[in-house]
């Protein structure tokens, strides 16, 4: 079985030994949790899905403040915090089980640049408007919903980093109204493939103007009645 270090080396990803040690501990914790927090039961699958998939499309250093919406098991926010020490990361999730897991992992990994908040994204984005340099999410919702619940917390000029699968083209078409309403534009798409055969894309959107105060709408509405 490959080690975390060997898998990252296969992809030419750069790292320092302390980062590998933290990822090792994180994967160990991840593989020990119940099935409702992760579907991965082996190291190779867990590293590909939760580490390689996050780092591979990133070409620049991330620094400043980052919000991970619907963080779940800590991906992508926790991984970004480990590999980009100049980032100050907030992991946001409304589920008690996820929040408890994340707090435990942060303590065990001794991560000083990460905090956890238990709240719905709609409430958090309204309360913490224009605060973050980056907002990221993976496997939380379709793009039009993400744009509404994430963009208000983003600074003008900041970037949305959304990890998507091959269906992102359809989601982009569907999200045009939301992007216009929330004042964001697509900056670039980075398509990439894992050696497992899976195809992925990182969508990078830039906020060019402050979002209207009416967004996000109240809890649940963006999911039930998305902007189309």
Curated annotation (Swiss-Prot):
The keyword DNA-binding does not apply. GO terms for cellular component: cytosol. SUPFAM superfamilies: S-adenosyl-L-methionine-dependent methyltransferases. It is found in: Cytoplasm. The keyword Transferase applies. GO terms for molecular function: rRNA (guanine-N7-)-methyltransferase activity. It comes from the Bacteria. InterPro entries: rRNA_ssu_MeTfrase_G, SAM-dependent_MTases_sf. This is Ribosomal RNA small subunit methyltransferase G. It comes from Thermotoga petrophila (strain ATCC BAA-488 / DSM 13995 / JCM 10881 / RKU-1). The gene is rsmG.
């Amino acid at each position: 079985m490959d080690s975390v270090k060997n898998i990252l080396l296969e992809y030419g990803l750069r790292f320092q030994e302390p980062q590998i040690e933290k990822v090792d501990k994180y994967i160990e914790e991840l593989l020990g949790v119940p099935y409702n927090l992760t579907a991965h039961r082996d190291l190779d699958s867990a590293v590909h899905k939760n580490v390689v998939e996050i780092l591979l499309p990133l070409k620049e250093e991330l620094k400043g403040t980052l919000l991970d919406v619907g963080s779940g098991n800590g991906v992508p926010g926790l991984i970004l915090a480990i590999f980009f020490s100049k980032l100050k990361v907030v992991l946001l999730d409304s589920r008690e089980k996820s929040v408890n897991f994340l707090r435990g992992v942060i303590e065990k990994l001794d991560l000083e640049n990460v905090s956890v908040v238990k709240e719905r994204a709609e409430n958090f984005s309204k309360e913490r408007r224009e605060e973050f340099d980056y907002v990221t999410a993976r496997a939380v919702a379709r793009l039009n919903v993400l744009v509404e619940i994430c963009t208000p917390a983003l600074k003008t000029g900041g970037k949305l980093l959304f990890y998507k699968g091959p269906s992102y083209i359809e989601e982009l078409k569907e999200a045009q109204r939301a992007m216009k309403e929330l004042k964001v534009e697509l900056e670039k798409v980075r398509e990439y493939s894992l050696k497992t055969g899976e195809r992925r894309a990182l969508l990078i959107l830039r906020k060019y103007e402050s979002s209207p105060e009416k967004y996000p709408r109240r809890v649940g509405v963006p999911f039930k009645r998305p902007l189309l």
